[in-house]
Each structure stands twice: as C-alpha cells, then as structure tokens.
C-alpha cells in the first residue's frame, strides 16, 4: 500500500506541474513573440531617383514618382540647414548643396548668421531615398530622404544618412536592406541652422550608438 501511495503522489506532482507550469511557459513565449513583432524590422529599397525605382519596379512608375517627390519635400523640411553656402559645402562637398527658402520657425543661431543669410538657407542635395510599405499595411509607400557627403573629412563621407544623422551604409542605390520601423517615421522639421561640422558630429554619434547597440545585441544572443 505504501508503494501505491508513493506512486500516486508522484503522479499528482507530475500532473500539477503539467497543469500549472505549461500556461506559464506559454505566457512567457507569447510575451517574447509579441515583443518580437513590435520590434520587427521593415524591408526597404534604396534609390537615387524615380527612374531607378521605376527600372527596378516595372509597372510602378507612378508610385515611384510620387514617393520620390514626397521624399524631396521631406528633405526640404527636415534636412540640416546652414546659414551660408560655405558651411554646407564644408560638410557635404562642392556641388552638393542648394539654396532653400527660409521655413516658418527657422532661426539662425546668431545675429551675424541672420544678416548673412538674407532670408534664405543652404541645405544638402538629396542623394537618394528609402522606399518601403506604409506602416499598418496600407497600399501606398513610405519614403525617407537620404543625404551623403563627398568631403572625405566628413563622417558622412560616402554613406547614406537620414536627416537625424543615422547611417545606412554605403551610398549605393539599388540595394535592399532591413531597417527598424522607426526609420521610416517622419522626422521633425528643422527649426535652427547647423554650425559647420555639426551634422557630421551627429553622424559620428549615431554611428557610435549603432555599434554599441549591435554589440549589446550580439552579447545578449551569445548569452
């Protein structure tokens, strides 16, 4: 009889564990799965202009043109602004800057810049743009302007960067990559001018943060 009781106790313990631990394990798994979905990346394509996009996407010429034009408007709104052409050229290189109309809320950092700007500012040319599906599964496309420097001394030299200075690798259009969904979110409008070299500093800081985040992720995966 004692042996029978012992067997029954063991069976009860196994049954209790199965009933109580399995839901906990499922709940933990569900949490990780939800976290993974929320942080999932988005696949985007990088193009230099609407023609590049149309060539890679036959039958999508209208969508490519719309995305390109929207990216240009976004670039005008969010690109780093400089009070002088010289400051912009020092950052992005000769032939890479254009004059942009002063925007509502734009304010030079000092009075000298205000007088020198004469109501207009300088900004880098849009070097390319990212194009991806609209968040939420819409039928349209989202776009994000990209900039690149041709000054070897700049941290943005030869790289695609967004208006916030985040680096997306070599400035080579026609490639596809995965980015966080936040990368395609609209950037805040530029409201002040940038000092010479200021955008390059932002790119350098962002690159350091990206490397640090990648290292942390690798260590976590490796235990």
Swiss-Prot record:
Residues 204-223 have a biased composition (Polar residues). InterPro entries: Biofilm_formation_YgiB. It comes from the Bacteria. Residues 201-223 are annotated as: Disordered. It holds the Pfam family DUF1190. Belongs to the UPF0441 family. This is UPF0441 protein YgiB. The lineage of its organism: Bacteria, Pseudomonadati, Pseudomonadota, Gammaproteobacteria, Enterobacterales.
């Amino acid at each position: 009889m004692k042996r029978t009781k012992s067997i029954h106790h063991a069976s009860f313990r196994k049954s209790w564990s199965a009933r109580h631990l399995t839901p906990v394990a499922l709940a933990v798994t569900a949490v990780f799965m939800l976290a993974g979905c929320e942080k999932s990346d988005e696949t985007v394509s990088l193009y230099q202009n609407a023609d590049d996009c149309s060539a890679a996407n036959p039958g999508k010429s209208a969508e490519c043109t719309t995305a390109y034009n929207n990216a240009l408007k976004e670039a005008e709104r969010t690109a780093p602004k400089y009070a002088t052409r010289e400051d912009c050229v020092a950052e992005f290189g000769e032939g890479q800057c254009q004059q942009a109309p002063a925007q509502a809320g734009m304010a030079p950092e000092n009075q000298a810049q205000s007088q020198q700007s004469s109501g207009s500012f300088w900004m880098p040319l849009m070097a390319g743009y990212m194009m991806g599906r609209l968040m939420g599964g819409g039928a349209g496309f989202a776009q994000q302007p990209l900039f690149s420097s041709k000054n070897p001394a700049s941290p943005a030299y030869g790289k695609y960067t967004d208006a916030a200075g985040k680096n997306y690798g070599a400035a080579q259009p026609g490639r596809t990559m995965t980015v966080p969904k936040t990368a395609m979110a609209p950037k805040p409008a530029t409201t002040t001018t940038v000092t010479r070299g200021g955008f390059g500093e932002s790119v350098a800081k962002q690159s350091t943060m990206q490397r640090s985040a990648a290292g942390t992720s690798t260590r976590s995966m490796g235990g």
